[in-house]
Amino acid sequence: MEHVKYILKQSWSRHSSSKWTEECPSCGQCGVTALVIQDHFGGTIFKTRVDESWHFYNSINGVVYDFTSEQFQAPIEYQHIPSSREEAFLDTNEEQYQHLREAFSRHMNSISEET
């Protein structure tokens, strides 16, 4: 799944999160990323409280993947609370979701064509 992290970094932008910066591309991307990853790989969306907000991430075939953890300075104390697409959508909007979904698919397809 290391290639997925690379593809996400290529796909994240201001269009997928208003908090995006070049210095911290994963900032504000957790909900939208969890949704797009679930679209492509299935699995479950989990949440954990970080400071005053919910942080969303995925579990696929029993393995936890948090592709946006680097946005936080301190290590995350994961609670692995089952969440839902509806909850993750509260962290984003349809426009950001569609943008990341399309960008991620485009980058996935270009890598597939190269191999």
UniProtKB/Swiss-Prot annotation:
Organism of origin: Bacillus subtilis (strain 168)
Record InterPro entries: YunG-like
Name of this protein: Uncharacterized protein YunG
